[in-house]
Amino acid sequence: MSGVVAAGFFDGVHLGHRKILEGADAALTFKNHPSSVLHPEAEPTLLMTFAEKEEVIKSCGVKKVIALDFTRELASEPPEKFIEFLSSFSKIRCGADWRFGKGAKGNAEFLRARGFDVEVVQYAEFQGERISSTRIRSALKKGDLESANAMLGRNWSVLGEIVAGKGVGRALGYPTVNLKILNTPPELPSGVYEVLVFGVKAIANWGYAPTMGDAAWVEKTLEIHFKGDTPKAFDDIAKSNQVKIEFARFIRQERKFANFEELKRQIKEDCEKVFN
């Protein structure tokens, strides 16, 4: 046996996960959340797609990601059977709450009793409390990007693809690139955000644009406006099939204005907060 494997679901690949992944040669994870099979009614909205998770895990220095499909068949296997996925490694790193096998009976002590070298990595903390994917989802739901990003160790991001706009932003003097979000984000509040696209600062509205009346979006859309001296960002987006949008800061909640002039004044104020 050789090499170190880090085991866990790693949704978000937050600072706590990074402690587990540190120094690992491989990561053992699932493509889908166990709740999607065992308790679909309670399945959490994931912080990232599997492709994003794999990319971030590898950016931590992990060479190989072993991704299993979580199925009812796998869930019904005894923990002794699950050991087959770990037997080629000399050491296993995991969090204190990592479990595997039927009835979640497999854990670090189960492996140690069978001769495995297991290191249980202590939780990372933020503001005196354990960092978890659940806690990050809760922060995003409140629009608390400062806390969410601090726990992630990077800006939370989504993937989007361009959709046709209605020209209203341009008519107001604030042209936008309009994106449909490809991965289902947590319940991020509708509102105005400071974002980064290709490393360029921008301002974005996530929501329905209710002031537009009949021109409002039927489903939530991300409308992104760049400062006037960054036309290259528009070109970069136009050339991309998928665009990564990093959320840096929550500015305000979305609301319906009495008229376009009132909306235009508010957009000007929002832009000053982001760009000045």
Sequence positions of predicted segments:
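N-terminal catalytic cores of NTP/NDP-binding nucleotidyl/phosphoryl-transfer enzymes
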Residues: 1-55
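Residue-level signal for inorganic ion chemistry
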Residues: 14, 57, 92, 148, ...
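A non-catalytic, amphipathic alpha-helix used as a structural packing/dimerization or gating element
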Residues: 19, 52, 147-154, 262-273
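Structural signal for conserved beta-strand scaffold positions within catalytic alpha/beta enzyme cores
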Residues: 27, 67, 120-122, 247
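N-terminal Rossmann-like or analogous alpha/beta NTP/dinucleotide-binding catalytic cores
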Residues: 36-119
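Glycine-rich, Lys/Arg-enriched anion-binding loops that position phosphate/diphosphate groups
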Residues: 116-208
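Phosphate/ribose-recognition catalytic cores of enzymes acting on nucleotide-derived substrates
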Residues: 166-276
